[in-house]
Amino acid sequence: MIYTVTIDASGAREAAQRGQLVVVVDVIDMSTTAEAAYQGGALAVYGASPDETASPVPRDPGWMAGYAAKEAKERSAELIVAAEPRTGSEAVQRQVAGKVFAALAKEGIEPTVVGNLGAEVTRLVDFKGKVVLIVSATGGVAFEAAALAHPQGPRGVLTATIARAGKLRGSQAARAGIQRAISQAGERGICIAAASGQSLEDVLAAQYLYELLLERVRR
């Protein structure tokens, strides 16, 4: 198996094209929101891009929203959208993620909408038994780019963080993310992808998670 670390949505996309399980790291806040959702009992967590982004990778937020909506229907679950701006009004969040909400409306889904707040998001909504879609200009873009390119689609992409989430403290959140990746990767290998090479916290977190991954698989 191949274990690698990369940066940016383009790097995540390249890893997906190789068939590696891609682990997106966007500490502030997408992957931390995702970990909080997992710890809160979410059934599945996905990422999508907003309508406007400077990233050069192929995007299709409507497709990602449709995928999440179909899973919610299949599992008879509610859908939660965590959107940006993180502290903006729902009206602004719906405008920024217009393609996502249009696709959900087409599927007949009316989601619960919260901000992409990181660990604090669990104070606003109960994630247990829900499907979650996080719309984010960094982690969401990287997740979507990888999902569109991966042979297994969104099933080939996960998230991880080094920040505390739920009841996890210290290195527990990081270890939870790595264990989830190892359990799902099989023989495909894993790529840890810092969502933005311009965000030092993502780059350092990705390197930490990569070293944690190597430590875990070499036991």
Task: Label each region the model flagged.
Residues M1-V5:
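N- or domain-start disorder-to-order transition segments that initiate the globular core
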Residues V22-V24, I80-P85, C191-S196:
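Short glycine-rich or small-residue beta-strand-to-loop segments that form or flank ligand, phosphate
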Residues S31-Y67, K73-P85:
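A short alpha/beta connector and helix-capping loop motif
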Residues P50, R86, N116-G118, A195-Q198:
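Short, ordered loop/turn segments at secondary-structure junctions
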Residues M64-L117:
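Ordered, amphipathic secondary-structure segments that act as subunit-interaction surfaces
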Residues A91-G98, A102, K106-T112, E120-R219:
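Long, charged alpha-helical interface segments
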